[in-house]
Amino acid sequence: MKNLKDLTYGIVGLGIMGGSFAKAIRQNILSQSGSTGKILVCNRSTACLSMAVNEGIADEAFTQDKTSELLKKSDIVFVCLYPHATLEFLKNYKNDFKSGAIVTDISGVKGIFEKSLPELLRPDVDFIIGHPMAGGEKEGYAASNAKFFVNHNYIFCRQTFNSEENYNLMKTLVTELGFTRITETTCDIHDNKIGFTSQLCHVIASALVQSARDPEITAFGGGSFEDLTRIAMINAPLWTELFISNKEKLCAHIDSFHKKMEEFRTAIMEEDSQKLKEMLEETREKRLMMGSVCTVSK
């Protein structure tokens, strides 16, 4: 297997995710004794490129018009762009990847890749579909940090054409970056489950904030309101794309949630204490059985 500390990593898109990958690779892998690896970064705006180089995170920075140069040098490429922008990137730079390179993404929807990949990639380039389950309300390179991925989940949607050696290398890599639970699944299952655990939650949080009639309602709020609405501080362009790209699965979850809300509403309006108590007790037991998203006990 290739040695991670001697590889060249290309990061395309230097926002909070791309920046965190670069910083985590620098701290956890390339800081090892005898390391010969490098980090190359590329971004549309140049301010963060200068920051990455000046901070000693990136060895080389490339403006958007020099992307091909980065790709020709990179052994592993993280494409940290929006889903459809990632597809366009793969299409436009198909012939520029280094032979034998591993390419991976960070997108929150996967079905669009599975349908398009066979025609987008060369046989000597291995695209491993991945989803780092980490995020935050802040955006941009300045918000990135080397510990961003610690104790988070990573999902791979392995394809039949993926090399066993490359796939194992990627699992080792993300473990070194701090991820503590790695799951392998299909693109369809990924989109269905992420539609529930992530996208539906963002819809609910957004709807809750939108339904507030009093802009000063937070004066009456406690931890519950804060917990439920934290993710409503949303990146609108990104989440619009994610919602629409996964519309069938997401809307099915919204319908199911709406049905449960109606059941609660009916029990409350009819003062059916027994029914309401049973529903709440069932909810508690079900949540306990689900376990924690956190992979390490606090």
PLM region spans:
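NAD(P)+-binding Rossmann beta1-loop-alpha1 motif at the extreme N-terminus of oxidoreductases
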Residues: 1-71
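Interdomain hinge/lid region at the active-site interface
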Residues: 216-286
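Internal alpha-helical scaffold of NAD(P)-dependent oxidoreductase catalytic cores
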Residues: 146-231
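Short beta->alpha hinge that forms the Motif I/post-I loop of the SAM-binding pocket
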Residues: 44-45, 81-82, 106
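Rossmann-like NAD(P)(H) cofactor-binding subdomain of soluble oxidoreductases
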Residues: 85, 89-142
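An anion/phosphate-binding loop that grips the pyrophosphate of nucleotide cofactors and donors
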Residues: 74
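N-terminal Rossmann-like NAD(P) cofactor-binding module of classical short-chain dehydrogenase/reductase
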Residues: 77-78, 104
